[in-house]
């Protein structure tokens, strides 16, 4: 006897969209295909909506412990749940202390207990001072590691710091021995420092964008690829914003380098031309690119050259968005709109097949992070689903946001679909009518 049968939906399978049934038992997908409704204890009618696999967001900053006024696991995971993301991997920075050793990871694990509405896991960090702790941190069960090439963090003890190329290579050698994946924020520090030194206060939107050019991203990507060839380390590039960087990564893939790449919805939905009007709310690193560059990035996405999409949800308190474009916090709050905003822009407006979007938001990140139970609608996988109604539009308001600090550059945007129901391991955790349902039931993944 099945616990639940989902019927009446357009199910987004790896092979394409099918109008079929999905049977769930003990939180797992047990059957796909026509089901006699007498074989299920409960029937859920999707009423013609798309049934997507729950999204897997591999790039969020929830800032806990240490900076919980910025977000926190409770509000951050509720935001993900409301948008159809059922699994996340949380970055090692913005929390204090950063996740750069076993003890700091343990503090994060304790802070996360009982707070999450979706399933979760964590990165470890590579910083200049923790090479001797990487093996122990790897054995603690982090799913991957993260480093910055450009300056980051602060002078506060325990905060995250960037590595130089020597530190990058040294860390790569150690991580390669463990078979670990290293995720890299790729912007060239020397190029950025030289350009920032020429900025005149107050720094406007155009000057800020010019201070972190595509060339800085491409150089850092190429330097990292060279280090990967030398060390054999598996690598992943986060939040890539330019087609030129994608082209360099594509060439490396053809040469056999073990590399993947993500981009973020804001690089497809927002442009440098809008930045002055949006203000520091839309400041991010790398910055938004001009529409001409954005069009090239869209071509890369539609052509399958980008492995997946992630939010890079990097929230802060409103006061940190005050000031000019140099001093304001660089980060966008966006994880609640992981699915709907890209379904509208990619599937409805540009004709991307829904199964391709499913690969971008769920299947590919789950595979790369070795989250074997996640990422696709297939027998044996966790019964994580997002129901997307493409027949309804809505305009996003601050009141609809579950973030601790209710600001986002997407507020005021009309989105041509709605996430109307979300299930985690077969249990409904969100509906459009009721909002978040029940108590936190998210589980820690992949820590051993």
UniProtKB/Swiss-Prot annotation:
Residues annotated as binding Zn(2+) 2 are: 146, 185, 239
Cofactors that this protein relies on? Zn(2+)
GO annotation (BP), single: purine nucleobase catabolic process
This entry's comment on the bound cofactor is: Binds 2 Zn(2+) ions per subunit.
Q: What is this enzyme's catalytic activity, as reactions?
A: (S)-allantoin + H2O = allantoate + H(+)
For this chain, the Swiss-Prot or TrEMBL PTM comment says:
Carboxylation allows a single lysine to coordinate two zinc ions.
Q: Which GO terms describe its molecular function?
A: allantoinase activity; cobalt ion binding; zinc ion binding
Annotated positions of the N6-carboxylysine modification? 146
What UniProt keywords are attached to this protein's entry? Hydrolase, Metal-binding, Purine metabolism, Zinc
Report which superkingdom the organism of origin falls in.
Answer: Bacteria
Q: According to its UniProt record, in which pathway does this protein act? A: Nitrogen metabolism; (S)-allantoin degradation; allantoate from (S)-allantoin: step 1/1
Q: Supply the EC number(s).
A: 3.5.2.5
Q: Which InterPro entries match?
A: Allantoinase (IPR017593), Allantoinase_bact (IPR047604), Amidohydro-rel (IPR006680), DHOase/Allantoinase_Hydrolase (IPR050138), Metal-dep_hydrolase_composite (IPR011059), Metal_Hydrolase (IPR032466)
Any single GO CC term annotated in Swiss-Prot or TrEMBL for this entry: cytoplasm
- Binding-site residues for Zn(2+) 1, renumbered to this chain: 59, 61, 146, 312
Under NCBIfam families, the record lists: allantoinase
Q: Describe its partners and assembly state.
A: Homotetramer.
Function recorded in the entry: Catalyzes the conversion of allantoin (5-ureidohydantoin) to allantoic acid by hydrolytic cleavage of the five-member hydantoin ring.
Which family is this protein grouped under?
Belongs to the metallo-dependent hydrolases superfamily. Allantoinase family.
Tell me what this protein is called: Allantoinase
Taxonomic lineage is: Bacteria, Bacillati, Bacillota, Bacilli, Bacillales
């Amino acid at each position: 006897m099945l616990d639940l049968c989902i019927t009446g939906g357009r199910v987004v399978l790896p092979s394409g969209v099918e109008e079929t049934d999905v049977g769930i038992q003990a939180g797992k997908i047990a059957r796909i295909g026509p089901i006699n409704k007498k074989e299920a204890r409960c029937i859920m009618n999707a009423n013609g909506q798309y049934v997507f696999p729950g999204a897997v967001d591999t790039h969020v900053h929830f800032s806990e412990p240490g900076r919980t006024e910025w977000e926190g696991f409770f509000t951050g995971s509720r935001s993900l749940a409301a948008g159809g993301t059922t699994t996340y991997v949380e970055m090692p920075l913005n929390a204090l202390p950063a996740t750069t050793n076993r003890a700091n990871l343990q503090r994060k694990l304790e802070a996360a207990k009982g707070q999450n509405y979706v399933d979760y896991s964590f990165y470890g960090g590579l910083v200049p001072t923790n090479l001797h702790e990487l093996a122990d941190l790897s054995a603690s069960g982090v799913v991957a590691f993260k480093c910055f090439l450009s300056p980051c963090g602060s002078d506060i003890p325990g905060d995250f710091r960037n590595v130089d190329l020597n530190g990058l290579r040294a860390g790569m050698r150690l991580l390669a021995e463990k078979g670990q994946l290293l995720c890299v924020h790729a912007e060239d520090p020397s190029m950025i420092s030289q350009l920032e030194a020429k900025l005149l206060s107050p720094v406007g939107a155009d000057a800020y964008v010019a201070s972190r050019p595509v060339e800085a991203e491409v150089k850092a990507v190429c330097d990292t690829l060279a280090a990967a060839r030398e060390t054999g380390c598996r690598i992943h590039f986060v939040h890539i914003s330019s087609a030129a960087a994608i082209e360099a990564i594509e060439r490396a893939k053809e040469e056999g380098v073990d590399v993947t790449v993500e981009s973020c919805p804001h690089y497809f939905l927002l442009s440098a031309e809008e930045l002055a009007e949006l203000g520091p709310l839309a400041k991010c690193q790398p910055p938004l690119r001009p529409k001409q560059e954005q069009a090239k990035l869209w071509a890369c996405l539609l052509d399958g050259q980008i492995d997946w999409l992630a939010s890079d949800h990097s929230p802060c308190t409103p006061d940190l968005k005050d000031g000019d474009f140099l001093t304001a916090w660089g980060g966008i709050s966006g994880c609640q709109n992981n699915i709907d905003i890209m379904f509208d822009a990619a599937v409805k407006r540009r004709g991307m097949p829904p199964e391709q979007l499913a690969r971008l938001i769920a299947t590919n990140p789950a595979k790369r992070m070795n989250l074997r139970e996640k990422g696709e609608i297939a027998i044996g996988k966790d019964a994580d689903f997002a129901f997307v109604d493409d027949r309804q539009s809505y305009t996003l308001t601050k009141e609809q946001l579950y973030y601790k600090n209710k600001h986002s550059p997407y507020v005021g945007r009309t989105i041509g679909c709605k996430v109307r129901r979300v299930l985690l391991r077969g249990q409904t955790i969100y509906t459009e009518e009721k909002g978040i349902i029940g108590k936190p039931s998210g589980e820690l993944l992949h820590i051993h």
